Swiss-Prot record:
It catalyses: L-methionyl-tRNA(fMet) + (6R)-10-formyltetrahydrofolate = N-formyl-L-methionyl-tRNA(fMet) + (6S)-5,6,7,8-tetrahydrofolate + H(+). InterPro entries: Fmt, Formyl_trans_C, Formyl_trans_C_sf, Formyl_transf_N, Formyl_transf_N_sf, Formyl_transferase-like_C_sf, Met-tRNA-FMT_C, Met-tRNA-FMT_N. It comes from Borrelia hermsii (strain HS1 / DAH). The keyword Transferase applies. This is Methionyl-tRNA formyltransferase. The gene is fmt. It is an enzyme of class 2 (transferase). Keywords: Protein biosynthesis, Transferase. Coiled coil: none annotated. It comes from the Bacteria. NCBIfam families: fmt (TIGR00460). Attaches a formyl group to the free amino group of methionyl-tRNA(fMet). The formyl group appears to play a dual role in the initiator identity of N-formylmethionyl-tRNA by promoting its recognition by IF2 and preventing the misappropriation of this tRNA by the elongation apparatus. Belongs to the Fmt family. PANTHER family: METHIONYL-TRNA FORMYLTRANSFERASE (PTHR11138), METHIONYL-TRNA FORMYLTRANSFERASE, MITOCHONDRIAL (PTHR11138:SF5).
Length: 309
């Protein structure tokens, strides 16, 4: 099977490696190089680097125009595998592939169709996540399901944790999907009546309101890691939060909202919220290194009694 691979994100790197090991990847479509680092030098993404190292043809156009279509046609692919590419394909492009196109989507479709299923699952406090390989359709994430699996989301898991899990555990589902397509199996139609949707994450998501419940705040903190990272002011410093958990309790009801009330060596730095106690587990002062809560407290012994704003 001649596979054309489309991705711009490192979440797909392990899948590219394993697919290329077992199949004929005839080309890779990815995003153009982007400025990176202090010098803002152009840098290729991990997908492009891996494909180049394997001598696979790489296309990184700004626009998927007719010239790109002709180049892909000349590669004579059977199928396109898409995993976090980041652009919408026109029908003219999808029609290139005689066996069709499949997409890896990190949710239990039809739940969380759209661009941020992992972040949205954590933001909503879901305890179960999933990976779906679907046939691509013109309507976003609405194609027939070829393979699917689910996994546990723990209370303290971040989006970064789930990205890593999905990256390492998608390949077998891709193999299952490819095998089904090779045998003429078209998959199972989604029940669109059960569909839910998610939108792009942006910098507004990083703003915290300590009047919310501890459950809601920890969800936002964990959803915003690795980007855009939730934060709040403490005195004149910006504190960036990387991981949190929570306690359902009515204790400390007389304390001010946003107040750091206790350091618990076995649980975290405790903060009063509108409902319950937030446990800060990993955090940093802006411009400093990320620390676990014990290291952060050891370097900031005057925390107790201060109030986040």
């Amino acid at each position: 099977m001649r596979i054309f691979f489309a991705s711009s994100e490192s979440i797909a790197l392990e899948v590219l490696k394993k697919v290329a090991d077992q199949h004929n990847v005839v080309g890779v479509l990815t995003a153009p190089d982007k400025p990176s680092g202090r010098g803002l030098f152009l840098r290729a993404n991990d997908i492009k680097v891996e494909a180049t190292n394997r001598n696979i043809t790489v296309l990184d156009p700004v626009v998927l125009n007719s010239d790109v279509v002709e180049i892909v046609k000349r590669l004579n692919p059977d199928l396109m595998l898409v995993f976090s590419y980041g652009k919408i394909f026109r029908q003219e492009f999808l029609d290139i592939f005689p066996m069709g196109c499949i997409n890896v989507h990190p949710s239990l479709l039809p739940k969380y169709r759209g661009p941020s299923p992992i972040q949205t699952a954590i933001l909503n406090g879901d305890t179960v996540g999933g990976i779906t390989v679907q046939k691509m359709a013109l309507e976003m994430d609405s194609g027939n399901i070829l393979s699917q699996s689910q996994f546990e989301i723990k209370s303290f898991n971040t989006s970064a944790d789930i990205f890593r899990y999905v990256s390492l555990n998608s390949f077998n589902l891709v193999l299952e999907a490819l095998s089904k397509l090779d045998k003429g199996n078209i998959g199972i139609e989604q029940d669109s009546r059960q569909a839910t949707y998610c939108s792009f994450f942006n910098k507004q998501h990083r703003i915290l309101d300590f009047n919310l419940s501890a459950f809601e705040i920890k969800n936002k903190i964990n959803a915003c890691n690795p980007w855009p990272l939730a934060r709040a002011k403490l005195d004149d410093d910006e504190i960036i939060f990387h991981r949190a958990d929570f306690i359902r309790t009515n204790d400390y009801s007389d304390q001010a909202i946003g107040k750091i009330i206790l350091f618990d060596p076995s649980r975290g730095i405790l903060v009063k919220t509108g409902d319950g106690i937030l446990l800060l587990l990993e955090l940093q002062r802006a411009g400093r290194k990320v620390m676990d809560y014990k290291s952060f407290y050891n370097g900031n012994r005057d925390l107790i009694g201060k109030i986040f704003s």
